[in-house]
């Protein structure tokens, strides 16, 4: 089965072609980072308009790279949520229009299920069951995964997502958007031990997260430095390191608890923050000590992309899931509502 995948949930326009027998044939991505950087964050209206501008050229590019014509495509998968409604509607409308014109089905895919399954595009994919850490700008969740569509929520953030905390902390210190990579870059030059940040909700049982207090702690630390006349680059680096260490250790502690609770030794990390090198090193060490395994997608498939949507859609269509003819998107969409295969 050959599936065209379209991703437009936020500020990346992603298109890909995935074949159930040959694997990923082509993928293309346009990031709107430069468009939104001047505003310090994503502007939904601008995001939607840019998706309209980029979608068809990217589809043509992917078809050309794969040496494919529309008559060879068996189905279209598109992101139906969660995400920005206007942005989602661009992808959904395009998918349904092309599906009608080409006489093929179009299936709405859950954005976070796409992220969760992205490591399965790698040469050594994880086997079910496993525990997944979904960590991005909009989500921080621990999920027990027994199969596609068989998801049990173990824990989630009670306020800010980890990626959101990275971005907001970076913005407080005057760093560029998106803040996550900027924090990680500065942390490499930070001096360990100058600042000690708390590990939120690690001093009590449970698998939920909270990052708003950590963000406030970072703000107060930065303001104290500025008040003392130290708004230097080194101060930013030291705060970035302390902040990143706190987030990474918190995520690692919770993942270890989740694995023990589920009785598993396989961990999948997915979402934009899963590209963070310090997080990968920490989780690899933890799983190594447990004699377990950790899986993640290649860096370009950690952030939003069309490949994960094409793959997830292909799995569901092959299992017999029927497409909906309605153009329906959801800004909020709990993964537990997805049907099991």
From Swiss-Prot:
Report the Pfam families cross-referenced here. Answer: TsaD (PF00814)
What is the name of this protein? tRNA N6-adenosine threonylcarbamoyltransferase
Q: Where, in this chain's numbering, is substrate bound?
A: 134-138, 167, 180, 276
Q: Which UniProt keywords apply?
A: Acyltransferase, Cytoplasm, Iron, Metal-binding, Transferase, tRNA processing
Q: Give the reaction(s) catalysed.
A: L-threonylcarbamoyladenylate + adenosine(37) in tRNA = N(6)-L-threonylcarbamoyladenosine(37) in tRNA + AMP + H(+)
Q: Which PANTHER family match?
A: TRNA N6-ADENOSINE THREONYLCARBAMOYLTRANSFERASE, TRNA N6-ADENOSINE THREONYLCARBAMOYLTRANSFERASE, MITOCHONDRIAL
The subcellular localization recorded is: Cytoplasm
Q: What does this protein do?
A: Required for the formation of a threonylcarbamoyl group on adenosine at position 37 (t(6)A37) in tRNAs that read codons beginning with adenine. Is involved in the transfer of the threonylcarbamoyl moiety of threonylcarbamoyl-AMP (TC-AMP) to the N6 group of A37, together with TsaE and TsaB. TsaD likely plays a direct catalytic role in this reaction.
Q: Which CDD domains match?
A: ASKHA_NBD_TsaD_bac
Cofactor(s) in the UniProt record: Fe(2+)
> What's the source species' lineage?
Bacteria, Pseudomonadati, Pseudomonadota, Gammaproteobacteria, Pseudomonadales
The EC designation for this entry is: 2.3.1.234
Q: What GO MF annotations does this protein's record show?
A: iron ion binding; N(6)-L-threonylcarbamoyladenine synthase activity
Give the InterPro entries listed for this entry. Answer: ATPase_NBD, Gcp-like_dom, KAE1/TsaD, TsaD
Tell me one GO biological process term. tRNA threonylcarbamoyladenosine modification
Q: Which gene encodes it?
A: tsaD
Annotated GO CC locations: cytoplasm
> What protein family is recorded?
Belongs to the KAE1 / TsaD family.
As to how many cofactors bind and how, the note says: Binds 1 Fe(2+) ion per subunit.
Q: Which residues bind Fe cation?
A: 111, 115, 304
């Amino acid at each position: 089965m050959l599936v065209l995948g379209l991703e437009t949930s936020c500020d990346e326009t992603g298109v890909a072609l995935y074949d159930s027998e040959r694997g990923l044939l082509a993928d293309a991505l346009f990031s709107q980072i430069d468009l939104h950087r001047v505003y310090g964050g994503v502007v939904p209206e601008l995001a939607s308009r840019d998706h309209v501008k980029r979608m068809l050229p990217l589809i043509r590019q992917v078809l050309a790279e794969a040496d494919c014509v529309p008559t060879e495509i068996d189905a279209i998968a598109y992101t139906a949520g969660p995400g920005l409604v206007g942005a989602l509607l661009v992808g959904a409308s395009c998918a349904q229009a092309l599906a009608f014109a080409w006489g093929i089905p179009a299936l709405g895919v859950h954005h976070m299920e796409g992220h969760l399954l992205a490591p399965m595009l790698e040469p050594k994919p994880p086997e079910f069951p496993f525990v997944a850490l979904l960590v991005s700008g909009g989500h921080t969740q621990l999920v027990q995964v027994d199969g596609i569509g068989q998801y049990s929520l173990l824990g989630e953030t009670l306020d800010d997502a980890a990626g959101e905390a990275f971005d907001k902390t970076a913005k407080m210190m005057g760093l560029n958007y998106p803040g996550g990579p900027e924090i990680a870059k500065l942390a490499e030059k930070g001096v360990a031990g100058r600042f000690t940040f708390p590990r939120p909700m690690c001093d009590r049982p449970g698998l939920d997260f909270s990052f708003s207090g950590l963000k406030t702690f970072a703000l107060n630390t930065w303001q104290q430095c500025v008040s003392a006349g130290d708004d230097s680059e080194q101060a930013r680096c030291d705060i970035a390191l302390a902040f990143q260490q706190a987030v990474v250790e918190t995520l690692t502690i919770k993942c270890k608890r989740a694995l023990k609770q589920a009785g598993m030794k396989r961990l999948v990390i997915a979402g934009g923050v899963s590209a963070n090198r310090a997080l990968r090193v920490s989780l690899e060490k933890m799983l190594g000590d447990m004699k377990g395994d950790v899986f993640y997608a290649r860096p370009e498939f950690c952030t939003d992309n069309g490949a994960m949507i094409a793959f997830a859609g292909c799995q569901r269509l092959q299992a017999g899931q029927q497409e909906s003819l309605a153009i329906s998107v959801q800004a909020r969409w709990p993964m537990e509502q997805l049907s099991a295969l």
